[in-house]
């Protein structure tokens, strides 16, 4: 559960990355493919897996924009993320473990680019991504 302090940090962070979703998302997704090559199997239409690839940029942008969109819904993530959880859990059948792998890659990418690297920020990002991961995994069948 995110504390009020965590929410304040996350809101500030999401506002900062709002204009960088394509670059940060592509880097995080490329990092996922590099560190966990088995995840490439969920993207059969991709011809490349680097951060410069058009499809990687597009999907990374979608993911980071979805995170930014949670900014006004931090008190109701289960409801806000329900459709994404349903799509990934029931339609795409993404193994829930992959959400944790990807959230780790997102955290590393954010840490590499953000100037604010306090323990409080790291903790808030970790808790936020853990909550998003939990919600996205909630409808897996």
UniProtKB/Swiss-Prot annotation:
Q: Which InterPro entries match?
A: Globin (IPR000971), Globin-like_sf (IPR009050), Globin/Proto (IPR012292), Hemoglobin_a-typ (IPR002338), Hemoglobin_oxygen_transport (IPR050056)
- In which family does this protein belong, per the annotation? Belongs to the globin family.
Q: Which GO terms describe its cellular component?
A: blood microparticle; haptoglobin-hemoglobin complex; hemoglobin complex
Q: Name one GO molecular function term.
A: peroxidase activity
**Binding sites annotated in the UniProt record for heme b:** 88
Q: Which residues form a coiled coil?
A: none
Q: Which UniProt keywords apply?
A: Heme, Iron, Metal-binding, Oxygen transport, Transport
List this protein's GO terms for biological process. Answer: hydrogen peroxide catabolic process
**Quaternary data:** Heterotetramer of two alpha chains and two beta chains.
Positions contributing to O2 binding: 59
What organism is the protein native to?
Torpedo marmorata
| Residues spanning the membrane | none
Q: What role is this protein assigned?
A: Involved in oxygen transport from the lung to the various peripheral tissues.
Q: What is this protein called?
A: Hemoglobin subunit alpha-2
């Amino acid at each position: 559960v995110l504390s009020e302090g965590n929410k304040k940090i996350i809101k500030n962070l999401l506002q900062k990355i709002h204009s960088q979703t394509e670059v940060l998302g592509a880097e995080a997704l490329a990092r996922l493919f590099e560190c966990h090559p088995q995840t490439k199997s969920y993207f059969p239409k991709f011809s490349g897996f680097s951060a410069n690839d058009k499809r990687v940029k597009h999907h990374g942008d979608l993911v980071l924009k979805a995170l930014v969109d949670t900014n006004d819904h931090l008190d109701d993530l289960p409801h806000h993320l329900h459709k994404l959880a349903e799509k990934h859990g029931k339609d795409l059948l993404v193994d829930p473990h992959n959400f944790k792998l990807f959230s780790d890659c997102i955290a590393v990418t954010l840490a590499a680019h953000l100037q604010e690297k306090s323990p409080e920020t790291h903790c808030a990002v970790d808790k936020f991504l853990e909550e998003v991961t939990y919600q996205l995994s909630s409808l897996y069948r």
